[in-house]
Design a protein with these regions (language model features):
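Structural preference for beta-strand elements that scaffold enzyme active sites
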Residues: 5-9, 52, 81-85, 105-108, ...
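Conserved anion-binding
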Residues: 13-28, 97-177
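Short catalytic helix/loop segments, enriched in acidic residues and glycine
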Residues: 24-43
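Glycine-rich, proline-tolerant flexible connector loops at the mouths of alpha/beta enzymes
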Residues: 50-71, 111, 171-180
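C-terminal helical cap(s) of enzyme catalytic domains, especially alpha/beta-barrels
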Residues: 119-127, 215-269
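Catalytic cores of alpha/beta
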Residues: 79-106, 186-223, 236, 240-241
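Conserved, mostly hydrophobic/aromatic
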Residues: 11, 45, 53, 99, ...
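Alpha-helix-loop-beta-strand connector modules within alpha/beta enzyme cores
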Residues: 63-86, 121-137, 180-208
């Protein structure tokens, strides 16, 4: 079987988690505290065997100031030993370069691929297509790249970034996000057939059955999936075991988190 990666998602708003895990009774303090300390949440997903963590900058997507979120994602990366892939919307290539230089393993580029293609090519050469990837958030197959660019089709965007040297893509449809209704497999097959880029899909996954369906597309280059809401609501069988263990170990976990937070503190980005 072709290896397939499941990546938990953390959404950040002003440096705080937008979601909180629904734990077993007795873990209320553990999980509520994590909303204020995303580093702890990243460490928890790692302890639960995450091989990568997906972080989304909700502030930037909404056009708001995201200084706190930018600082937080660097702290998170320094606190875990697996890659963090960071989806943010920045106005210039230099903002992505600073994140990479600060240690964030992977950044997902969108708008600036259109507004500064030469700068993106340079960034790819400097940091490699493994660390510089591209993000598509589509609606009815259209991608909104902001007032300076407007709408392009997802196919136009994917072919464009492939020509720049991109070799990995995160793809989601707005209607999938938080819906727990699964993903449109025909859409994924269509975008997978455009290039030979590796593809991570995101949004909509609600159950192991949804995962198995996506995994069938692995021969097309779909090698991973980002899961948010379903992971926080414990919809997968293994999670019940994790939450029961965490309920018993809550004081010990907090002690570990406090120690890790002290060791991983950093200066401003």
């Amino acid at each position: 079987m072709i290896p397939f990666l499941v990546i938990p998602a953390i959404d950040l708003v002003q440096g705080r988690c937008a979601r909180c895990i629904l734990g077993q009774p007795g873990t209320e303090t553990l999980y509520s505290d994590m909303s204020d300390h995303p580093v702890e949440l990243a460490q928890l997903w790692r302890r639960e065997n995450a091989k990568a963590i997906h972080v989304t900058d909700i502030d930037a997507i909404k056009g708001l100031d995201d200084d706190l979120t930018m600082q937080q994602v660097v702290r998170m990366q320094r606190a875990v030993d697996v890659p963090i892939q960071f989806v943010t919307v920045q106005k210039d290539v230099e903002s992505y370069r600073r994140l990479l230089a600060a240690g964030v393993y992977r950044v997902a580029i969108n708008r600036v691929a259109w507004t500064d293609p030469d700068g993106v090519r340079e960034l790819l050469d400097e940091y490699s297509p493994s660390r510089v990837i591209f993000g598509v958030r589509a609606h009815n197959s259209d991608v909104d790249l902001g007032p300076d660019v407007g709408m392009v089709t997802d196919e136009e965007f994917i072919r464009h970034v492939y020509e720049l040297g991109g070799r990995r893509l995160i793809y989601t449809e707005c209607d999938w996000e938080g819906s727990l209704t699964g993903q449109n497999l025909d859409t994924i097959r269509r975008i997978a057939g455009l290039t030979n880029m590796r593809i991570t899909t995101a949004g909509g996954i609600a159950s192991p059955r949804d995962l198995w369906a996506i995994q069938e597309l692995a021969p097309l280059g779909v090698d991973s999936v980002v899961i948010g809401r379903a992971m926080y609501e414990n919809t997968f069988p293994c999670q019940r075991i994790w939450r029961e263990i965490e309920a018993e170990l809550e004081p010990e976990l907090h002690a570990r988190f406090d120690d890790d937070m002290e060791q991983s503190s950093i200066s401003r980005l």
